């Protein structure tokens, strides 16, 4: 039996009752509706405006250099003063949790950009909707953005983009009705982390049928008894919207014959949906191998990375025969 190291991050939208709304509320903006006007208000939270309030950005003063996360770049801005990138980032000490954003609704997050330093597996991002005391999203920041192996690889998709050199971008629309709270915890017990970030959101009416964004993080090491639960324990009406896998191989041979199965609404022995193989589920085929020819004209077997708007094999860590021995893969759909 093959053993594998497998990490998964999944996301879903849990919906409420449906409701018809004809007036455009400014949500779900795209190239096809940019001409439509609404009463939505655009706001953005960053270290330069930690509340997102109107007319309150860029107010950090270098004289506050001794206050944590108030004027972190005061030395670089010492000759420029207020209004000149005095606090573009925050620092999170070992074991500390920093509140990145608190937003009063109704509204929706439309885009998040961040570039965290340190060990991405040791940085835990959490999202709380409305009056929640337990988070709907709790995930290492690297896995949330498709970088579960802690090293950069280009990722270009409709929902998540990771750009040089470590710019994490998320375009999931995440509505809330009363409140949104986002935190980042540094569970590294030795090193502080530096975080540049921006949370772009809109304040507007939210349809009654809008769901709340949820995500589960799971890790199996090794994957025994060869069954890894990607999603489990979800109840109620909802919509499965995606998965990211960080897959490590411990043995020789092709690793991707595992079938993705969906057990829905009471399924027990047999699922409702069953795929034909791992690479097939991620919209590839035949081991992700294109048998490209080398300079001598001989076909060589090798993995081919790819990114598309909705699926991809964006990362292949092939090993160097030295300290990085195992092959590792990053896949999304």
Language model features with spans:
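Bacterial N-terminal signal peptides
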Residues: 7-16
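Beta-strand-centric surfaces of beta-sandwich/beta-rich domains
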Residues: 21-333
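Positively charged n-region of N-terminal signal peptides that target proteins for export
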Residues: 1-4
């Amino acid at each position: 039996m093959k053993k594998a190291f497998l990490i998964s991050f999944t996301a879903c939208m849990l919906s409420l009752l449906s409701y018809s709304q004809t007036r455009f509320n400014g949500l779900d903006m795209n190239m096809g509706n940019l001409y439509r006007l609404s009463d939505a208000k655009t706001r953005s939270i960053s270290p330069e405006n930690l509340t997102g309030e109107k007319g309150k950005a860029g107010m950090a003063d270098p004289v506050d250099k001794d206050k944590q996360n108030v004027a972190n770049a005061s030395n670089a801005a010492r000759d420029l003063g207020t209004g000149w990138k005095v606090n573009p980032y925050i620092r999170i000490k070992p074991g500390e949790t920093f509140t990145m954003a608190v937003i009063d609704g109704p509204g929706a997050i439309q885009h998040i950009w961040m570039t965290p330093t340190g060990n991405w597996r040791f940085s835990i991002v959490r999202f709380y909707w409305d009056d929640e005391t337990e988070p709907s999203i709790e995930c290492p920041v690297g896995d949330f953005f498709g970088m579960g192996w802690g090293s950069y690889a280009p990722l270009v998709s409709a929902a998540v983009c990771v750009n040089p050199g470590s710019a994490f971008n998320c375009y999931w629309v995440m509505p809330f009705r009363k409140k949104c709270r986002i935190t980042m915890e540094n569970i590294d017990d030795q090193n502080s982390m530096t975080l540049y970030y921006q949370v772009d959101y809109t304040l507007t009416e939210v349809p009654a049928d809008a769901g709340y964004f949820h995500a589960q993080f799971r890790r199996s090491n090794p994957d025994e008894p060869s069954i890894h639960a990607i999603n489990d324990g979800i109840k109620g009406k909802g919509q499965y919207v995606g998965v990211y896998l960080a897959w490590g191989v411990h043995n020789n041979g092709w690793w991707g014959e595992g079938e993705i199965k969906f057990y829905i609404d009471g399924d027990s022995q047999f699922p409702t949906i069953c795929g034909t193989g791992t690479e097939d589920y991620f919209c590839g085929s035949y081991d992700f191998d294109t048998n490209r020819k080398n300079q001598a004209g001989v076909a060589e077997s090798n993995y081919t990375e790819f990114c598309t708007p909705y699926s991809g094999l964006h990362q292949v860590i092939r090993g160097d025969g030295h300290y990085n021995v195992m092959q590792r893969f990053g896949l999304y759909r």
